[in-house]
A protein has these predicted regions:
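N-terminal secretory targeting modules
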Residues: 1-96, 103, 108, 144, ...
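Catalytic nucleophile serine of serine hydrolases
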Residues: 101-102, 124
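Alpha-helical cap/lid subdomain in secreted, periplasmic
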Residues: 112-121, 128, 132-276
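Short hydrophobic segments within beta-strands
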Residues: 98-99, 191
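Short, functionally important structural connectors and interaction interfaces within domains
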Residues: 8, 67, 77, 94, ...
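Conserved beta-strand elements of the Class I
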Residues: 96-98, 121
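Alpha-helical protein-protein interaction elements
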Residues: 42, 64, 70, 90, ...
Length: 276
Protein backbone atom coordinates (compact mmCIF):
# COMPACT_ATOMS: atom_id res chain seq x y z
CA UNK A 1 0.00 0.00 0.00
CA UNK A 2 1.51 3.42 -0.93
CA UNK A 3 2.83 5.42 1.99
CA UNK A 4 0.34 8.28 1.53
CA UNK A 5 -2.59 5.84 1.82
CA UNK A 6 -1.15 4.40 5.00
CA UNK A 7 -0.74 7.89 6.42
CA UNK A 8 -4.37 8.66 5.60
CA UNK A 9 -5.53 5.47 7.31
CA UNK A 10 -3.48 6.20 10.40
CA UNK A 11 -4.73 9.77 10.60
CA UNK A 12 -8.33 8.61 10.44
CA UNK A 13 -7.73 6.03 13.12
CA UNK A 14 -6.01 8.45 15.45
CA UNK A 15 -8.91 10.86 15.06
CA UNK A 16 -11.75 8.44 15.70
CA UNK A 17 -10.51 5.25 17.33
CA UNK A 18 -10.32 4.87 21.11
CA UNK A 19 -6.74 5.58 22.12
CA UNK A 20 -5.96 4.40 25.62
CA UNK A 21 -7.39 3.11 28.84
CA UNK A 22 -10.23 2.81 27.85
CA UNK A 23 -7.30 1.71 26.11
CA UNK A 24 -7.70 -1.18 28.42
CA UNK A 25 -8.37 -3.93 25.86
CA UNK A 26 -11.54 -5.63 27.02
CA UNK A 27 -11.76 -9.35 27.58
CA UNK A 28 -13.17 -11.58 24.82
CA UNK A 29 -16.89 -12.10 24.37
CA UNK A 30 -18.02 -14.18 27.30
CA UNK A 31 -21.18 -14.19 29.38
CA UNK A 32 -20.71 -12.32 32.64
CA UNK A 33 -19.53 -14.48 35.51
CA UNK A 34 -18.45 -13.82 39.06
CA UNK A 35 -15.05 -15.40 38.56
CA UNK A 36 -12.17 -12.98 39.19
CA UNK A 37 -10.27 -11.91 36.14
CA UNK A 38 -6.88 -10.26 35.69
CA UNK A 39 -6.59 -6.72 36.99
CA UNK A 40 -7.71 -4.37 34.23
CA UNK A 41 -8.00 -1.31 36.44
CA UNK A 42 -5.01 0.49 34.96
CA UNK A 43 -4.91 1.72 31.38
CA UNK A 44 -2.45 0.17 28.99
CA UNK A 45 -0.07 2.19 26.89
CA UNK A 46 -1.27 3.57 23.58
CA UNK A 47 -1.20 0.83 20.96
CA UNK A 48 2.15 1.19 19.13
CA UNK A 49 0.39 0.67 15.80
CA UNK A 50 -1.12 4.14 16.19
CA UNK A 51 2.29 5.78 16.46
CA UNK A 52 4.40 3.59 14.16
CA UNK A 53 6.01 5.05 11.07
CA UNK A 54 3.88 4.15 8.04
CA UNK A 55 6.84 2.52 6.30
CA UNK A 56 7.27 0.13 9.24
CA UNK A 57 3.78 -1.37 9.04
CA UNK A 58 3.49 -4.95 7.90
CA UNK A 59 0.45 -6.11 5.90
CA UNK A 60 -0.98 -7.76 9.02
CA UNK A 61 -0.65 -4.46 10.91
CA UNK A 62 -2.54 -2.61 8.20
CA UNK A 63 -5.26 -5.27 8.15
CA UNK A 64 -5.62 -4.99 11.93
CA UNK A 65 -6.03 -1.22 11.73
CA UNK A 66 -8.56 -1.52 8.93
CA UNK A 67 -10.57 -4.04 10.95
CA UNK A 68 -10.70 -1.71 13.96
CA UNK A 69 -11.82 1.17 11.79
CA UNK A 70 -14.52 -0.99 10.18
CA UNK A 71 -16.14 -1.71 13.58
CA UNK A 72 -15.77 1.68 15.24
CA UNK A 73 -18.72 1.15 17.66
CA UNK A 74 -17.41 -2.36 18.44
CA UNK A 75 -20.65 -4.11 17.61
CA UNK A 76 -18.77 -7.40 17.42
CA UNK A 77 -17.78 -7.26 21.08
CA UNK A 78 -21.05 -8.62 22.49
CA UNK A 79 -22.71 -10.00 19.36
CA UNK A 80 -22.14 -13.65 20.25
CA UNK A 81 -22.92 -13.17 23.95
CA UNK A 82 -26.17 -11.43 23.03
CA UNK A 83 -27.14 -14.26 20.72
CA UNK A 84 -26.75 -16.75 23.57
CA UNK A 85 -28.51 -14.64 26.18
CA UNK A 86 -31.98 -15.99 26.85
CA UNK A 87 -34.96 -13.69 26.98
CA UNK A 88 -35.93 -12.58 30.49
CA UNK A 89 -38.03 -15.14 32.32
CA UNK A 90 -41.57 -14.18 33.36
CA UNK A 91 -41.29 -11.80 36.28
CA UNK A 92 -37.56 -11.27 35.79
CA UNK A 93 -36.55 -7.62 35.83
CA UNK A 94 -33.36 -7.52 33.84
CA UNK A 95 -31.09 -4.50 34.13
CA UNK A 96 -28.38 -3.63 31.61
CA UNK A 97 -25.34 -1.77 32.92
CA UNK A 98 -24.15 0.27 29.95
CA UNK A 99 -20.90 2.16 29.85
CA UNK A 100 -17.16 2.29 29.25
CA UNK A 101 -14.20 0.71 31.08
CA UNK A 102 -15.60 1.59 34.50
CA UNK A 103 -18.57 -0.63 33.71
CA UNK A 104 -16.58 -3.13 31.65
CA UNK A 105 -14.13 -3.84 34.48
CA UNK A 106 -16.87 -4.42 37.06
CA UNK A 107 -16.65 -8.13 37.81
CA UNK A 108 -13.65 -8.62 35.53
CA UNK A 109 -11.17 -6.86 37.75
CA UNK A 110 -9.74 -9.14 40.41
CA UNK A 111 -11.59 -9.08 43.74
CA UNK A 112 -14.69 -7.47 42.29
CA UNK A 113 -18.04 -9.19 41.78
CA UNK A 114 -20.83 -8.12 39.46
CA UNK A 115 -23.97 -8.45 41.58
CA UNK A 116 -24.08 -12.25 41.99
CA UNK A 117 -27.55 -13.70 41.80
CA UNK A 118 -29.03 -10.58 40.19
CA UNK A 119 -30.47 -10.51 36.65
CA UNK A 120 -28.02 -7.81 35.66
CA UNK A 121 -26.17 -7.79 32.34
CA UNK A 122 -22.90 -5.92 31.81
CA UNK A 123 -22.47 -4.27 28.43
CA UNK A 124 -19.57 -1.93 29.10
CA UNK A 125 -16.77 -1.51 26.57
CA UNK A 126 -13.48 0.00 27.63
CA UNK A 127 -12.57 3.27 25.98
CA UNK A 128 -15.97 4.05 24.52
CA UNK A 129 -17.48 7.47 24.11
CA UNK A 130 -21.15 8.41 23.93
CA UNK A 131 -21.37 8.41 20.10
CA UNK A 132 -20.09 4.84 20.00
CA UNK A 133 -22.51 3.83 22.73
CA UNK A 134 -25.41 5.43 20.89
CA UNK A 135 -24.66 3.40 17.75
CA UNK A 136 -24.73 0.08 19.62
CA UNK A 137 -27.64 0.93 21.91
CA UNK A 138 -30.19 -1.18 20.03
CA UNK A 139 -28.02 -4.28 19.87
CA UNK A 140 -26.62 -4.13 23.40
CA UNK A 141 -29.60 -2.68 25.30
CA UNK A 142 -32.96 -2.63 23.52
CA UNK A 143 -32.72 -6.10 22.00
CA UNK A 144 -31.92 -7.61 25.42
CA UNK A 145 -35.39 -6.56 26.64
CA UNK A 146 -34.38 -5.16 30.02
CA UNK A 147 -36.71 -3.55 32.51
CA UNK A 148 -34.11 -0.84 33.10
CA UNK A 149 -30.80 0.45 31.78
CA UNK A 150 -28.12 2.10 33.91
CA UNK A 151 -26.06 4.43 31.73
CA UNK A 152 -22.63 5.61 32.89
CA UNK A 153 -20.90 7.53 30.12
CA UNK A 154 -19.13 10.74 29.20
CA UNK A 155 -15.72 10.70 30.84
CA UNK A 156 -13.99 9.39 27.71
CA UNK A 157 -15.68 12.12 25.67
CA UNK A 158 -14.13 14.70 28.00
CA UNK A 159 -10.79 12.92 27.58
CA UNK A 160 -11.12 13.17 23.79
CA UNK A 161 -10.93 9.44 23.14
CA UNK A 162 -12.78 9.65 19.82
CA UNK A 163 -11.94 13.21 18.86
CA UNK A 164 -13.12 16.66 19.80
CA UNK A 165 -16.31 16.63 21.86
CA UNK A 166 -18.37 19.50 23.23
CA UNK A 167 -20.71 19.38 26.24
CA UNK A 168 -23.64 19.76 23.85
CA UNK A 169 -22.53 16.71 21.87
CA UNK A 170 -22.30 14.58 25.01
CA UNK A 171 -25.67 15.81 26.23
CA UNK A 172 -27.30 15.06 22.87
CA UNK A 173 -25.98 11.50 22.89
CA UNK A 174 -27.10 10.84 26.46
CA UNK A 175 -30.49 12.37 25.70
CA UNK A 176 -30.84 10.18 22.60
CA UNK A 177 -30.03 7.00 24.52
CA UNK A 178 -32.57 7.90 27.19
CA UNK A 179 -35.23 8.64 24.57
CA UNK A 180 -34.58 5.32 22.82
CA UNK A 181 -34.93 3.49 26.11
CA UNK A 182 -38.19 5.21 27.03
CA UNK A 183 -39.60 4.53 23.56
CA UNK A 184 -39.11 0.83 24.30
CA UNK A 185 -40.56 1.01 27.82
CA UNK A 186 -37.16 0.66 29.48
CA UNK A 187 -36.67 2.58 32.74
CA UNK A 188 -33.67 4.91 32.64
CA UNK A 189 -31.00 5.39 35.30
CA UNK A 190 -28.45 8.09 34.45
CA UNK A 191 -25.29 7.91 36.52
CA UNK A 192 -23.04 10.83 37.28
CA UNK A 193 -19.56 10.67 35.83
CA UNK A 194 -17.03 9.61 38.43
CA UNK A 195 -14.67 12.30 39.73
CA UNK A 196 -11.42 12.77 37.83
CA UNK A 197 -8.72 15.38 38.27
CA UNK A 198 -6.49 14.17 35.42
CA UNK A 199 -6.47 11.44 32.77
CA UNK A 200 -3.27 9.38 32.92
CA UNK A 201 -3.36 8.79 29.16
CA UNK A 202 -3.95 12.48 28.37
CA UNK A 203 -2.46 14.74 30.98
CA UNK A 204 -3.27 18.38 31.48
CA UNK A 205 -6.91 18.57 30.41
CA UNK A 206 -8.04 19.75 33.86
CA UNK A 207 -11.33 17.86 33.59
CA UNK A 208 -12.71 18.35 37.12
CA UNK A 209 -14.88 21.38 36.30
CA UNK A 210 -16.10 19.79 33.06
CA UNK A 211 -17.13 16.67 34.98
CA UNK A 212 -19.03 18.74 37.55
CA UNK A 213 -20.81 20.72 34.82
CA UNK A 214 -21.85 17.62 32.91
CA UNK A 215 -23.07 15.96 36.09
CA UNK A 216 -25.20 19.01 36.85
CA UNK A 217 -26.79 18.68 33.41
CA UNK A 218 -27.36 14.92 33.86
CA UNK A 219 -29.05 15.53 37.22
CA UNK A 220 -31.28 18.25 35.77
CA UNK A 221 -32.18 16.20 32.70
CA UNK A 222 -33.03 13.13 34.79
CA UNK A 223 -35.31 15.17 37.06
CA UNK A 224 -37.11 16.77 34.12
CA UNK A 225 -37.60 13.55 32.17
CA UNK A 226 -38.57 10.90 34.67
CA UNK A 227 -35.19 9.20 34.89
CA UNK A 228 -33.41 8.22 38.09
CA UNK A 229 -30.19 10.11 38.81
CA UNK A 230 -27.47 7.93 40.32
CA UNK A 231 -24.98 10.13 42.17
CA UNK A 232 -21.67 8.29 42.30
CA UNK A 233 -19.78 11.58 42.26
CA UNK A 234 -20.76 12.91 45.68
CA UNK A 235 -19.93 9.62 47.36
CA UNK A 236 -16.47 9.35 45.81
CA UNK A 237 -15.01 12.82 45.13
CA UNK A 238 -12.14 14.20 47.15
CA UNK A 239 -11.60 17.92 47.80
CA UNK A 240 -9.79 18.32 44.47
CA UNK A 241 -12.64 16.85 42.46
CA UNK A 242 -10.73 13.64 41.89
CA UNK A 243 -10.57 10.11 43.26
CA UNK A 244 -8.31 9.06 46.11
CA UNK A 245 -5.91 6.19 45.38
CA UNK A 246 -7.90 3.90 47.65
CA UNK A 247 -10.88 4.22 45.31
CA UNK A 248 -9.03 4.43 41.97
CA UNK A 249 -5.36 3.57 41.74
CA UNK A 250 -4.85 5.52 38.52
CA UNK A 251 -7.32 8.25 39.38
CA UNK A 252 -9.93 7.00 36.90
CA UNK A 253 -10.64 3.27 37.17
CA UNK A 254 -12.19 2.06 40.45
CA UNK A 255 -10.39 -0.36 42.72
CA UNK A 256 -12.33 -3.12 44.50
CA UNK A 257 -12.94 -0.57 47.27
CA UNK A 258 -14.29 1.86 44.69
CA UNK A 259 -16.70 -0.68 43.27
CA UNK A 260 -17.75 -1.66 46.79
CA UNK A 261 -18.75 1.96 47.38
CA UNK A 262 -20.59 2.17 44.06
CA UNK A 263 -22.55 -1.10 44.33
CA UNK A 264 -25.10 -0.13 47.02
CA UNK A 265 -25.71 3.20 45.28
CA UNK A 266 -26.46 1.36 42.05
CA UNK A 267 -28.78 -1.06 43.86
CA UNK A 268 -30.75 1.80 45.42
CA UNK A 269 -31.08 3.54 42.06
CA UNK A 270 -32.29 0.34 40.41
CA UNK A 271 -34.83 -0.18 43.18
CA UNK A 272 -36.15 3.35 42.65
CA UNK A 273 -36.35 2.92 38.88
CA UNK A 274 -38.20 -0.39 39.06
CA UNK A 275 -40.64 0.82 41.70
CA UNK A 276 -42.06 3.57 39.49
Amino acid sequence: MPAFRIRTLLLALVLIAPIASAQDHAAPDQPRTDQPRPDQSRPEAIDPLYTAAPSSLAPDDIASLQQRLADWPQLARYREANAHLEAPKPGERRVVFYGDSITDNWGRQQDTAFFPGKPYVNRGIAGQTTPQMLVRFRQDVIDLKPAAVLILAGTNDIAGNSGVSTPEMIEDNLRSMAELARAHHIRVILASILPVSDYPWRRGLQPADKVRALNAWIKQYAAANGAVYLDYYSAMANQDGGLDAELAGDGVHPTPAGYARMAPLAEKAIERALSH
